[in-house]
């Protein structure tokens, strides 16, 4: 009996040793999260992104005083949220299993220093921190990728079309917008002047699709039997609040801009006592429109559907109701 107990004790010790050994082995095989990422930059703050395509086209995004700008567009504001989300996505890219490790594989997958679909350079204080080469993948929404510090190729969840090199793709398209609840008054010269009633609008809701309160908009320019169509007036305010641009046309007035006089002029007063003047006109030979806002030195391209919608919203018959 004593020998049996001794053998069982030895067997138990061996089993415990085996369990501990397996746990240690598995722990050793589980790489830290940072080692599973395509790139790792630690706590370094990236303040510059440069994206280049196979044809040599390039866009540079620079973080200045906490905001992203586009130097090639005269330091025009970039879409801060879009840039930050893109940067975070780059830092979270996982390596997975390599799909190639030889020089021939790097060439075939187009992730070489001079052979790529996209090159993304991340810098801090003008120092290169990380560099990623992207090549095409046969799978949708995927790309072959390699860090400049690695000789292996990995397939990642980021398509090359999600990494544009056109500056307009990174511009803040909302730069001329005025938040809906910040609009205090709207003047359409020669048509109507509207004033917002703050007593009818508590301003507690941020939903610009909400039904306007009774008598939210008023005007002193109404004739006998006329009243404000609240839905129509509110549609105009909402059209201003969602106004977006698709490109920066520069700071110089051109003869093809039909702004002398403009097709539409809007004067908007805000809750902060600021005045913003919008001038909208057609562009000779094009479907889209040109917009000039007094808050910016640039001229902007506005999509045709947004421009025509804004023009229709300023029609007096849409805003003013006449009693028969």
Predicted regions and their residues:
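Secondary-structure "cap/kink" motif recognition
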Residues: 1-324
